[in-house]
Amino acid sequence: MANSYPSVDANTQQAIYNNPQYTDNQANPSSVGKQIRLDVYEKQALLDIVKEQYFSQLADTTDMPKNMGKTIKKFHWLPLLDDRNVNDQGLDAAGASYANGNLYGSSKDIGAISGKMPTLTEVGGRVNRVGFTRKVIEGSIHKMGFFYEFTEEAMNFDTEAELMSHMVRESMRGANELTEDQIQLELLQGAGVMVYTGTATDKATMSAEGAAGTESLITYKDIQRLSVTLDENRCPKSTKIITGSRMIDTKTINSARVMFIGSELENQFRNMLDAFNNPAFIPVEKYADAGTLLNGEIGAISQFRIVVVQEMMHWEAAGVTAVNGLGVYRTGAGNKYNVYPALVVGSEAFTNIGFQTSGANKKWKITTKLPGADTADRTDPYGETGFSSIKWYHGMLIQRPEWIAVLHSLAVL
């Protein structure tokens, strides 16, 4: 027997819940308006995508003030005793001018250091003058966005009752992946440390064609060499990560730097041997503490925590042409070797530039209009089509490029 619902006319003095399923009482709907709870869908989607954020968990957000343009600038002061501190202010202990004005700079040579100590005589004088250098770093924000459309009949007759929630979820996942890809791309392009495996000196010379031991394959020795370079660059060994569904909590991972790799390199890391031919890889279950794990973390090697990113980018067909290695290593167009990065990002090496953000999270602005009077106009006089759009601002400021490193390797099939 068909259900019978009361007429709205019988409740004209009350606010009526306009249940969309009660089609026979919609002829005289309450002024309270249509029922739609997109905020529930959006909240659930936000909770879901936190699990898919890899690079965002390392960055805080620098908020762009309103009415101040789209570019943010910061001063980066270089240390006094640093080869990058080049100026014309230098006077030595004898009062003579010398180049660079940074005493002995970054030198570790005992002879050079002992000869440039800023000693003073009894009368002092104009001696031991030094200078300082600062650099201006800057980043800009850009507005991003996309939209999708749907018809009233799609919502009413589609097999999936949760059609709208699925579209909201997938659009927010898409926006999150776009943001992650933007961050990853800028980190790969902005890295200040480049390391090439084997005998290669750049991506174009990456090869597996040489004698055994010269192939451009990542080894434990490469990882040790990279660790020393980052130590010399004063890259922090502790890493701050942003956690929680609201992305406002922070935790610190002590004595570890984060290395991001693609799934193509995972087996090479798991099978890696150290200098004593012992397994170098420590799987995550050996040390796991649920409060300090990163999204995608699989284990550790030396001083690095290894995170596998399923959407990790690579350089297609960037190496030499494969002959001996064809069918053994991954290749692209023209049978040239693909080159895969292992990306290391030091803590606070970069910051996201946001506009009207919340905490350290991107603030996505979603606009949804359901089919009906809200969307009806001369191009759609019957209001049959609705739409939803999502937009956000993205920008990134690389603060310490010398704390970002890319280790290049071929990948075994």
PLM-predicted stretches and their roles:
Residues 129-158, 353-365, 370:
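Short acidic, glycine/tyrosine-flanked loop/strand segments centered on an H-E-D-like triad
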Residues 91-95, 164-173, 276-280:
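Amphipathic alpha-helical scaffolding segments
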Residues 142, 148-152, 156-158, 162, ...:
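Structured, hydrophobic secondary-structure cores that serve as assembly/anchoring elements
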Residues 2-58, 203-244, 254-413:
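Sequence/fold signature of self-assembling virion shell proteins
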Residues 74, 169, 173, 181, ...:
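Hydrophobic alpha-helical segments involved in membrane association or supramolecular assembly
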Residues 57-144:
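Assembly/oligomerization interface modules of large self-assembling protein complexes
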Residues 154-243:
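Alpha-helical scaffold segments that mediate packing/assembly in large oligomeric complexes
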Residues 63-66, 156-166, 250-253, 373-385, ...:
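Exposed beta-sheet edge/beta-hairpin loop segments within beta-rich domains
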